[in-house]
Amino acid sequence: MSQSTSVLRRNGFTFKQFFVAHDRCAMKVGTDGILLGAWAPVAGVKRCLDIGAGSGLLALMLAQRTSDSVIIDAVELESEAAAQAQENINQSPWAERINVHTADIQQWLTQQTVRFDLIISNPPYYQQGVECAIPQREQARYTTTLDHPSLLTCAAECITEEGFFCVVLPEQIGNGFTELALSMGWHLRLRTDVAENEARLPHRVLLAFSPQAGECFSDRLVIRGPDQNYSEAYTALTQAFYLFM
């Protein structure tokens, strides 16, 4: 495509097929989002929803991984982040397939009739505490504008019967999120615990829930091997995206 695959640009992250500027977004491109975007199951999906789209990273990763017929809706409450997501998407190969909506997800859903095969979110997880100096960062970090019960309710309102709702969270918070989801009628179908290396306990967890009951497949992903290079499993998961992998 463009210069994004050949020239490293500032104020963002250069991937193999697209560039994500994030200087106007409270939360930057990071390993959590990259893991989630590469891991979420996309087989057979027709319509995807990204809740809290931020810079547009997840929507772009899903677009790269899916066929040209798949439509992706990216909903972001914060106007500056939504504007930057739109710019990132406009410069990508998939601008015709991704729709950015500057909106509160709860209000936006009241106007929708479509259902989604895949819903994805890298949600806030801090409880309200010391206020951030930047309101946009507080919104991105804390569960004040969309708490976890509300997020699960939103997803339940618009998912298909066999669809998946995927999130990434810190390990302990993910365990609590799972208990909450199960109590609300969701079924855990996929779980990957993520550790920095073999010697460390998992610090992140990737979760996929569905309205439909079924077996839960669980595994563990180690990011770095003994030599501190990326592990074979992490490389296999993310090499379609990282520029120098």
UniProtKB/Swiss-Prot annotation:
Source taxon at top rank: Bacteria
E.C. designation(s): 2.1.1.223
Entry-linked Pfam families: MTS
GO cellular component assignments: cytoplasm
A single GO molecular function term of this UniProt record: nucleic acid binding
Reactions performed catalytically: adenosine(37) in tRNA1(Val) + S-adenosyl-L-methionine = N(6)-methyladenosine(37) in tRNA1(Val) + S-adenosyl-L-homocysteine + H(+)
Major localization listed first in the record, in broad terms: cytoplasm
UniProt cross-references to InterPro entries, sorted A to Z: DNA_methylase_N6_adenine_CS, SAM-dependent_MTases_sf, Small_mtfrase_dom, tRNA_Adenine-N(6)_MTase, tRNA_adenine-N6_MeTrfase
Record's subcellular location: Cytoplasm
UniProt similarity note: Belongs to the methyltransferase superfamily. tRNA (adenine-N(6)-)-methyltransferase family.
Name of this protein: tRNA1(Val) (adenine(37)-N6)-methyltransferase
Native organism: Shigella boydii serotype 18 (strain CDC 3083-94 / BS512)
Gene: yfiC
